[in-house]
Amino acid sequence: MRAYEVVYVLTPDLEEEQVEEKHNEFKSVIERYGGAPGEIDVWGKRRLAYEIDDYQEGIYALRKFQGENQVLTELERSLKMDESILRYLIARDEDA
């Protein structure tokens, strides 16, 4: 399995419990398709470089994980369909 990391930005109007649910939801997608979720680093609410969908702030999080192509495909599909995601980026983790 290859190592990856995903950075995503959630809308700032989510409650703390909702944010935790989102983190767990993406973790379960990784596990469901044979991946191994790693550590998550929640950066919290930060100002965006530019306005996205009328939001000037977002809740940033970085999750490391390992997986094959199907994990990437399904995680990306979940991120695209989730309306509380403003932006995301999945990259291969060269340091792992």
UniProtKB/Swiss-Prot annotation:
Protein name: Small ribosomal subunit protein bS6
InterPro entries the record matches: Ribosomal_bS6, Ribosomal_bS6_sf, Ribosomal_S6_plastid/chlpt, Transl_elong_EF1B/ribsomal_bS6
Example of a GO cellular component annotation carried by this entry: ribonucleoprotein complex
SUPFAM superfamilies: Ribosomal protein S6 (SSF54995)
HAMAP family: Ribosomal_bS6
Protein family (similarity comment): Belongs to the bacterial ribosomal protein bS6 family.
PANTHER family attached to this UniProt entry: MITOCHONDRIAL 28S RIBOSOMAL PROTEIN S6, SMALL RIBOSOMAL SUBUNIT PROTEIN BS6M
UniProtKB keywords: Ribonucleoprotein, Ribosomal protein, RNA-binding, rRNA-binding
Pfam entry (one): Ribosomal_S6
Superkingdom: Bacteria
Lineage start: Bacteria, Bacillati, Bacillota, Clostridia, Natranaerobiales
Entry function: Binds together with bS18 to 16S ribosomal RNA.
A Gene Ontology BP annotation from the UniProt entry: translation
GO MF annotation list: small ribosomal subunit rRNA binding; structural constituent of ribosome
Organism: Natranaerobius thermophilus (strain ATCC BAA-1301 / DSM 18059 / JW/NM-WN-LF)
Keyword Metal-binding: no
